[in-house]
Curated annotation (Swiss-Prot):
Residues 39-154 form the tRNA-binding domain. Its EC number is 6.1.1.20. This is Phenylalanine--tRNA ligase beta subunit. It comes from Chlamydia caviae (strain ATCC VR-813 / DSM 19441 / 03DC25 / GPIC) (Chlamydophila caviae). Tetramer of two alpha and two beta subunits.
Length: 793
């Protein structure tokens, strides 16, 4: 949203420096950028009044004008169509430097045009660098009638503009009034309404229409005004709209736009001859129907979409845009002016079905002030009557009523608890009151807070805490220890910190997937309807589709490799209800590392993804004896390169090489290795034990290697864990050295070589002690290996 500083200052009881305004916006959470337009010379371009004009003797399209700057007269040859006696315009004197439409500089000089001397040049706003104030092509800029003569034209036109980036929760700031109101909360000025918006109430008639949908539109107002026309707006109104980045159209439309940009209430104008005011109302479309809009675009309005209609036909998309057939045009002399409050959810749904965006829709989707509907309509009517003194205004027809303001219970001690410092209830109460919140009652430090009608973002108690915190410049030193994070939050932080610091890139993908991306997962996903999107309709039950799509995008853009992870929410459906699970996904593809003079090309493998899981478990102090890797079968993975992880008899996740057909479907030429773990399961199975660091051993260790013949279906890791389960006091570790399997298809056995490391913490073991312990462990292991099948009992 772009606002001019001069327009914004009119809403303050006293002017504020631009620096203080920017600091206030930053304090309340509004990002701003400042632009100052001052592009021309101060002294050489002045204000002057056209006294008279006569036709040029040698040119049909030129006139010879006499201008007066308050002290002397000038003869100027001018070709602007609006050059006429009585107007005050910018006059560029000899020596003034201007720029043409291509940005090239030129200097004004005395010259003769078709034989007549010209002592300068009459200027348009665009020629002075103020293109936003230019309302007509090749026209002169017209100052108000009370503009002093001989003053610097550039000084009068120069202004500072503030570009505000509003977050969705700050819809109440999408107007000069709303922005000024927020700024006054953190400054020492009061909010005031400019005179044109302070109006006496007009006559209203409350009506009932059978088709009016109160849930869609709680209050709907319209008024008939006759004796108007599509004449051009006064220069003052055109300048005001130009400062708000709005193009002037005609007087009636300009008034409605000015009210919307100033007060935040969208208005719409109909041709009274095309609309029946007595049956005009808001409802949902009963069937699909075509509609041609003001922008000449023909759309199909689906059944259930919010519309405005009378007894005969549809005249507009509610809260978005009117129809072309019912619009105000050059021949209109009688209008119907509409002001209403639509529920934000209804207009958001309409924009989903009919994606037409407008300034009105921008405000309605974020929520406007329902209590401002009638005051804004009063202001528009008074402005129209000012421009058209003979206009006749009928009583305002009101359908419905203003919705009641909501009330929240608020514990004052919650602010101190969140801030981590003591805070008196009176401080909280006074701060809320200064922000426009009325306290209806107070009991035991619990306030009953009435929410202002324009604050649609205040829904819960914590929102009130945020209001107090964001607008109050607290400067109290907090010596209290920070609050303890939830176990899941702490676990996620540890996982993210480790993986990111270890070299993986963190990805963020959307929880909702389009059908094409969701198809990358070979499991069936549950589809849901979402009003915010036509494409993203599948709620993910795995991180795989999003990560796979992101990997394909990066590899197709010539990234040498993708080593990435994501921590996010997945959704499973149990008993017709969705259950949220916090999951970790790791994906590897491409090269193992970037090729350089010191490194060679090394391919990734199944063991690369397995190594990341093991390093993560080691970082999280998950003992290697606590988890088991078991065979697994899933359509997403390569049939012989996948495994499932069990931790304390709970399924923790799965990992492996993705199926080549799946990679081909994702348009990835490289092998892809993927792991997905449930952080919920990991959190629930982790033991809260004190992890102690051990010093390096001072006594030497010894190792013995053994080779066992077992059935090919026996996991090698099960032999390692079986040896560790015997609880030998000297057995320090067991590791797998090699696995050999004969290529002969008739052979169903394999050889597994293990290394056993023996060590005592208090002395050096003798060879005899090591041999005896080694033989004992080997005998115990052989006793559990089935001699006929080679399996472990």
């Amino acid at each position: 949203m772009r606002v001019s500083l001069s327009s914004l200052q009119r809403f303050f009881s006293s002017p504020l420096p631009i620096k203080q305004i920017i600091e206030a916006c930053d304090h309340i959470g509004i990002e701003t950028e400042v632009e100052t337009l001052l592009t021309c010379s101060f002294s050489s371009i002045i204000t002057a009044k056209v006294l008279k004009t006569v036709p040029h003797p040698n040119a049909d399209k030129l006139v010879v004008a006499t201008l007066f700057d308050g002290q002397q007269e000038y003869q100027i040859v001018c070709g602007a169509p609006n050059c006429r006696p009585g107007i005050i315009i910018p006059l560029a004197l000899p020596g003034a430097k201007l720029h043409d439409h291509e940005g090239n500089a030129y200097t004004i000089k005395k010259s003769k045009l078709r034989g007549v001397e010209s002592q300068g040049m009459c200027c348009g706003a665009d020629e002075l660098g103020f293109a936003h104030l230019q309302t007509t092509e090749r026209g002169l800029f017209e100052f108000p009638e009370n503009t002093p003569l001989g003053e610097s034209a550039c000084a009068l036109l120069a202004d500072t503009f503030i570009e505000c980036s509003l977050t969705p929760n700050l819809g109440h700031c999408a107007s000069l009034l709303g922005l000024a109101r927020e700024i006054t909360y953190v400054t020492n000025v009061d909010l005031v309404l400019p005179p044109e918006f302070v109006c006496t109430p007009l006559e209203t008639i409350t009506k009932e229409t059978s088709g009016q949908d109160q849930h869609l539109c709680p209050i709907f107002c319209c008024v008939k005004i006759s004796g108007v026309s599509a004449q051009a707006s006064p220069q003052e109104l055109q300048n005001a709209l130009g400062g708000l980045k709005q193009k002037s159209i005609n007087s009636i439309v300009d008034i409605t736009n000015y009210i919307m940009l100033s007060l935040g209430q969208p208005l719409h104008v109909y041709d009274a001859n095309a609309v029946d005011i007595d049956s005009l109302h808001a409802q949902k479309a009963q069937k699909d129907e075509p509609l041609k809009l003001l922008n000449n675009e023909e759309v199909l309005v689906p059944q259930g979409t919010a519309i405005i209609c009378d007894k005969d036909h549809t005249v507009g998309l509610a809260g978005v845009m009117g129809s072309l057939d019912s619009s105000f045009n050059d021949a209109t002399t009688e209008i119907i002016l509409e002001a209403a409050y639509f529920l934000p959810s209804a207009i958001r749904a309409s924009q989903t079905h009919v994606p037409i965006h407008s300034e009105a829709a921008y405000r309605f989707t974020r929520g406007i002030d329902p209590n401002n509907v009638l005051p804004a309509l009063y202001a528009a009517i008074h402005y129209i009557q000012k421009l058209f003194p003979n206009a006749k205004v009928s009583p305002i027809q009101v359908l419905g009523s203003t919705p009641q303001a909501s009330t929240l219970s608020f514990r004052t001690e919650l602010v101190g608890k969140i801030l981590g410092m003591p805070l008196h209830a009176s401080q909280v109460r006074d701060q809320l009151h200064s922000l426009g919140f009325n306290i209806s009652s107070e009991e035991n430090s619990i306030l009953s807070v009435n929410i202002p009608s324009y604050r649609h973002d205040i829904q819960e108690e914590i929102d009130l805490v945020e209001e107090v915190c964001r607008t109050q410049p607290w400067k109290v030193e907090n010596k209290k220890a920070p609050a303890i994070y939830s176990p899941m939050y702490s676990l996620k932080r540890r996982v993210v910190d480790f993986l990111a610091n270890s070299g993986l890139q963190q990805f963020f993908t959307c929880d909702l997937l389009d059908t094409e991306t969701a198809a990358l997962n070979r499991e069936e996903a549950d589809c849901i309807s979402l009003q915010g999107s036509k494409q993203a309709t599948v709620l993910r039950d795995s991180l795989l589709p999003g990560l796979l799509k992101s990997t394909a995008t990066n590899l197709n853009r010539q990234a040498p490799y993708v080593h990435a992870f994501e921590v996010g929410t997945t959704y499973t459906k149990k008993s017709s209800k969705y259950q949220e699970t916090q999951s970790l996904g790791i994906i590897l593809s491409g090269q193992a590392e970037e090729i350089s003079w010191i490194s060679h090309e090394r391919p990734l493998s199944f063991y690369s993804i397995k190594g990341w899981i093991e390093r993560l478990f080691q970082y999280l102090h998950v003992s290697s004896q606590a988890y088991a890797i078991q065979p697994y079968e899933h359509a997403n993975f390569h049939p012989y390169q996948q495994a499932e992880i069990h931790l304390h008899k709970h399924v923790l996740g799965r990992f492996g090489t993705l199926h080549p057909q799946l990679c081909k479907k994702a348009q990835i030429k490289h092998s892809v290795f993927f792991a997905e773990l449930s952080l919920d399961s990991l959190l629930h199975t982790q033991k809260k034990a004190l992890h102690l660091y051990k010093p390096y051993p001072i006594y030497p260790s010894s190792f013995r290697d053994i080779t066992l013949t077992v059935h090919e279906s026996v996991p090698a890791d099960s032999l390692r864990k079986k040896l560790l389960s015997f609880h030998s006091k000297w057995l320090e570790s067991v590791s797998i050295i090699s696995i050999y399997q004969n290529k002969n298809p008739t052979t169903q056995n394999k050889n597994v070589s293990l290394r056993l490391v023996f060590q005592d913490k208090e002395r050096t073991l003798s060879n005899q002690e090591i041999e005896e312990e080694h033989e004992r462990l080997l005998a115990m292991l052989n006793a559990q290996i089935n001699d006929t099948k080679g399996t472990i009992d």
